[in-house]
C-alpha cells in the first residue's frame, strides 16, 4: 500500500478499484436493483387483483397473513401484496384495481414474518384501504 507525501493519486485509484468488491456498491452502480424491480424504480404501482392468497407467517409466529396476487398494469408482472388492517381483505375483490407500494422492509425487501412479500396494498379502486377499514369511506362500485 502506498503511503507518502505524493501517494494521494495511487491511494484514490486503489480505493476506486476495490470498491467493486463491495456487493452493495456494485449492484447500485450497475442499476441491478431497478432492473429486477417489478415497479421499475417507481414508488407505487397500479395493478389488477388476480386472486386472494393466505400466506403462513414464519416461525415462531403462527398466522395466515391475508395477501393478494396482483398483475401490474405497466408491465404485466405478477407480485404478491400484503393487505394491512383487520378485515382489510374483505374490501378487496378479484378484478379490483389496487395501488401497491413497498412494504418497508430492510434494504427494500420483505418485512417481519412475511417471507417473499415485498409490497402492500394502499388503495382499492382509488380509495385508501385504511379509510375503508376504519369505516370512513365506502368502496365505489365499478
UniProtKB/Swiss-Prot annotation:
The segments labelled Disordered in the record are: 1-44
Which superkingdom?
Archaea
* Keyword line: Ribonucleoprotein, Ribosomal protein, RNA-binding, rRNA-binding
Q: Where is the composition biased (Basic and acidic residues)?
A: 19-38
What Pfam families does UniProt report for this protein, alphabetically? Answer: Ribosom_S12_S23
Q: Where is the composition biased (Basic residues)?
A: 7-18
Keyword flag Ribonucleoprotein: yes
Alphabetical list of SUPFAM superfamilies matching this protein? Nucleic acid-binding proteins
A GO MF term:
structural constituent of ribosome
Q: Which GO terms describe its cellular component?
A: small ribosomal subunit
GO BP term, example: translation
Give the protein's biological function.
Answer: With S4 and S5 plays an important role in translational accuracy. Located at the interface of the 30S and 50S subunits.
Belongs to which family? Belongs to the universal ribosomal protein uS12 family.
Q: How does it assemble?
A: Part of the 30S ribosomal subunit.
Name of the molecule in the record: Small ribosomal subunit protein uS12
Amino acid at each position: 500500500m502506498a503511503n507518502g507525501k505524493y501517494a494521494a493519486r495511487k491511494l484514490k485509484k486503489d480505493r476506486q478499484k476495490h470498491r467493486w468488491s463491495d456487493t452493495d456498491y456494485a449492484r447500485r452502480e450497475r442499476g441491478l436493483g431497478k432492473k429486477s424491480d417489478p415497479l421499475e424504480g417507481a414508488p407505487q404501482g397500479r395493478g389488477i387483483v388476480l386472486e386472494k392468497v393466505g400466506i403462513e407467517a414464519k416461525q415462531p409466529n403462527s398466522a395466515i397473513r391475508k395477501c393478494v396476487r396482483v398483475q401490474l398494469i405497466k408491465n404485466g408482472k405478477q407480485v404478491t401484496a400484503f393487505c394491512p388492517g383487520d378485515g382489510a381483505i374483505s374490501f378487496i375483490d378479484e378484478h379490483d384495481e389496487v395501488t401497491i407500494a413497498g412494504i418497508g422492509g430492510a434494504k427494500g425487501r420483505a418485512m417481519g414474518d412475511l417471507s417473499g412479500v415485498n409490497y402492500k396494498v394502499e388503495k382499492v379502486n382509488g380509495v385508501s384501504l385504511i379509510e375503508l377499514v376504519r369505516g370512513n369511506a365506502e368502496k365505489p362500485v365499478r
